[in-house]
Each structure stands twice: as C-alpha cells, then as structure tokens.
C-alpha cells in the first residue's frame, strides 16, 4: 500500500513580518520546510513526498536544496488560489491506492508517534486527524457580549490529516466553499465521519515571530 505525504507550503510570511516566506526561515540553521520533509522521510523512506509551493517560490526552493545539500526525493506541485486548490493540485500527483497525509509545511515538530498513529489508523478508519486538548478557558462571542463554554467540548486540530487516497480525491472533486477550512471539513462534506487521534503539543504551526522563538527552543 502506497503512503504519500502531501506537504502544503503556500505562506508569504505576512504575519511573520518577514520578506522571506515563513516556510523558508531557518531554525537551527536549516529552513523550516526541510525539517518538515525530513520528519516524514524519517518515518518511511519509501513514502512518496509531494511538496505544494507557489510557482514563484519553486526556483528559490531548489536553490535552498542545493545550498543545504538537501537530497530527499520529492515532487513539486503548483500552489493554488486557496489551500483547497493547492491540495487539489497536489493530489493530481498521487500515485496508486493507499493513504495520503496532508501536512502544513510549517509544522516541523510533528512526532514520529503521531505520524505513525495517523497513517496506521487511516488504513482502517479512512479519515484520521490529530488533535490536542484545549487548556485555556474558552469564551463564545455573542451579540450581547460573550459567555464561557466548556473546553471539554472542543479540541485543537493539527496535521497530518490522513485519508484513504481514493476517498480524498473524490472529496476534492466537490465545488469549493469558504467552509472548507481544512481537509477534514472537505471529507466531512461527503458525510464521512472523521476519527480523532492524539496529537503532540510540540507540533506547532510556525506563523509568528513568537512561534519562531518557540521553535528554536524545541530543537
């Protein structure tokens, strides 16, 4: 059975306040995106890796790979107008049957245990996402103000979100709507239940300068 990691990296670094897109920023002397690809290659050296990048960033990425001697084999697909369209472009390169894990390119600290958990469960469950507990108090905004809600009723969603390849391709044949905030929401729109597994709290999404400081501390 074929395993594929589809790494989506379309950020422009606006929230980071940097001219360099966040996926290319260095942590410990190595670009974030390289560390992300390494995590999946470490889990399964035979895994197909597809990187989705805006076309205008692809030459720079190749230069970075040459500069760092980065030789993990991967295919590159063009980023789309939205994350939905980027994933759809990447899926066009997926070979054969099996499972596909879609992962944010700026989440380099996903653990090997979480990757394994998601990919192994997806063989049986067909649709699996990692989540972590909400540890802060949560308030719901209302027209009259706000109210406390039970944090036990909520989870924070991470990636990789892993699905049966055929199921995922069919899901992405649906027409795009703004309600598709992640891959699980696309699959759920077909009436398919999504199974939750435990994520790892270190699996942060690096989007701000503070996140970059945390990432450096995690090395």
Curated annotation (Swiss-Prot):
InterPro entries: IspD, IspD/TarI, IspD/TarI_cytidylyltransf_bact, Nucleotide-diphossugar_trans. The record marks 151, 205 as: Positions MEP for the nucleophilic attack. Keywords: Isoprene biosynthesis, Nucleotidyltransferase, Transferase. GO terms for biological process: isopentenyl diphosphate biosynthetic process, methylerythritol 4-phosphate pathway. Its EC number is 2.7.7.60. It is an enzyme of class 2 (transferase). Transmembrane segments: none annotated. It catalyses: 2-C-methyl-D-erythritol 4-phosphate + CTP + H(+) = 4-CDP-2-C-methyl-D-erythritol + diphosphate. Pathway: Isoprenoid biosynthesis; isopentenyl diphosphate biosynthesis via DXP pathway; isopentenyl diphosphate from 1-deoxy-D-xylulose 5-phosphate: step 2/6. The record marks 15, 22 as: Transition state stabilizer. It comes from the Bacteria. GO terms for molecular function: 2-C-methyl-D-erythritol 4-phosphate cytidylyltransferase activity. Catalyzes the formation of 4-diphosphocytidyl-2-C-methyl-D-erythritol from CTP and 2-C-methyl-D-erythritol 4-phosphate (MEP). Belongs to the IspD/TarI cytidylyltransferase family. IspD subfamily. This is 2-C-methyl-D-erythritol 4-phosphate cytidylyltransferase. It comes from Bacteroides fragilis (strain ATCC 25285 / DSM 2151 / CCUG 4856 / JCM 11019 / LMG 10263 / NCTC 9343 / Onslow / VPI 2553 / EN-2). The gene is ispD.
């Amino acid at each position: 059975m074929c395993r594929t990691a589809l790494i989506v990296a379309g950020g422009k670094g606006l929230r980071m306040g940097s001219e360099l897109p966040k996926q290319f920023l260095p942590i410990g002397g190595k670009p974030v995106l390289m560390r992300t690809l390494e995590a999946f290659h470490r889990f399964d050296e035979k895994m197909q890796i597809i990187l989705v990048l805006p076309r205008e960033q692809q030459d720079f990425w190749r230069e970075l790979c040459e500069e760092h001697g980065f030789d993990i084999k991967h295919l590159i697909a063009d980023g789309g107008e939205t994350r939905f369209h980027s994933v759809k472009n990447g899926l066009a390169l997926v070979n054969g049957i099996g499972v596909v894990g879609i992962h944010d390119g700026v989440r380099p600290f996903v653990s090997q245990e979480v990757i394994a958990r998601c990919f192994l469960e997806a063989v049986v469950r067909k649709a699996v996402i990692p989540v972590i507990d909400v540890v802060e108090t949560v308030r719901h905004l209302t027209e009259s103000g706000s109210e406390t809600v039970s944090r036990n009723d909520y989870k924070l969603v991470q990636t990789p979100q892993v699905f049966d390849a055929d199921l995922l391709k069919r899901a992405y044949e649906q027409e795009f709507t703004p309600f598709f905030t992640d891959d699980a929401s696309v699959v759920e729109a077909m009436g398919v239940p999504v199974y939750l597994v435990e994520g790892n709290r270190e699996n942060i999404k690096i989007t701000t300068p503070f996140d970059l400081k945390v990432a450096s501390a995690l090395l």
